[in-house]
């Protein structure tokens, strides 16, 4: 059985001449990038583990120096690579909080169990997330990820129950 990997960042460029790379994090936990930790990089269908030698934040980027990457030429080859961790390596979330990959694909039903569609995307707006629900017919529904609307999320059953506010459909 192959392990399932979750993307936590993307290599977008090099930084300096000593083999550092710029990462755009796709995690809410940039502190997960820790010296001496190993992390997988998926590039052109190949996954390889690297050891984090140094890590720091710079503007909206995380800068990482991998032990195995000696210079800028080697770092160039990592551009476009996805930093990934296994499910077991994910930072545990507090109860009632979910990773985006857990939300996307959930069936959405209203308080009467009427199916509304499937979560296709999560928009991160700053104030609160918004779930984009694809319907089999008609326009997408935008559902704010707030407790007064989202009444229940059941990852095991693959279902989200919502109480629609007037005007959402």
UniProtKB/Swiss-Prot annotation:
Give yes or no: UniProt keyword Protein biosynthesis.
Answer: no
The PRC barrel domain is annotated at: 95-168
Domain remarks: The PRC barrel domain binds ribosomal protein uS19.
**PANTHER family hit by this protein:** RIBOSOME MATURATION FACTOR RIMM (PTHR33692:SF1)
* NCBIfam families noted in UniProt: 16S_RimM
Outline what the protein does: An accessory protein needed during the final step in the assembly of 30S ribosomal subunit, possibly for assembly of the head region. Essential for efficient processing of 16S rRNA. May be needed both before and after RbfA during the maturation of 16S rRNA. It has affinity for free ribosomal 30S subunits but not for 70S ribosomes.
Q: What is this protein called?
A: Ribosome maturation factor RimM
Organism the protein comes from: Desulforamulus reducens (strain ATCC BAA-1160 / DSM 100696 / MI-1)
């Amino acid at each position: 059985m192959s392990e399932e990997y979750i993307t936590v960042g993307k290599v977008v460029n090099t930084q300096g001449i000593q083999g550092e790379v710029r990462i755009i994090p796709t995690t809410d936990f940039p502190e997960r990038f820790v010296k001496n930790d190993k992390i997988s990089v998926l590039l052109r269908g190949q996954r390889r583990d690297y050891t984090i030698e140094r890590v720091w934040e710079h503007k909206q980027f995380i800068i990482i120096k991998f032990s195995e990457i000696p210079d800028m030429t080697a770092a160039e080859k990592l551009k476009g690579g996805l930093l990934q961790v296994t499910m077991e390596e994910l930072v545990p979330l507090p109860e009632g909080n979910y990773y985006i990959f857990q939300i996307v694909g959930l069936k959405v039903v209203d308080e009467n169990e009427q199916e509304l569609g499937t979560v296709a995307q999560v928009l991160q707006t700053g104030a609160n997330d918004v779930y984009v629900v694809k319907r089999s017919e008609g326009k997408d529904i935008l559902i704010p990820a707030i407790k007064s609307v989202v009444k229940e999320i059941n990852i095991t059953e693959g279902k989200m129950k919502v109480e629609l506010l007037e005007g959402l459909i």
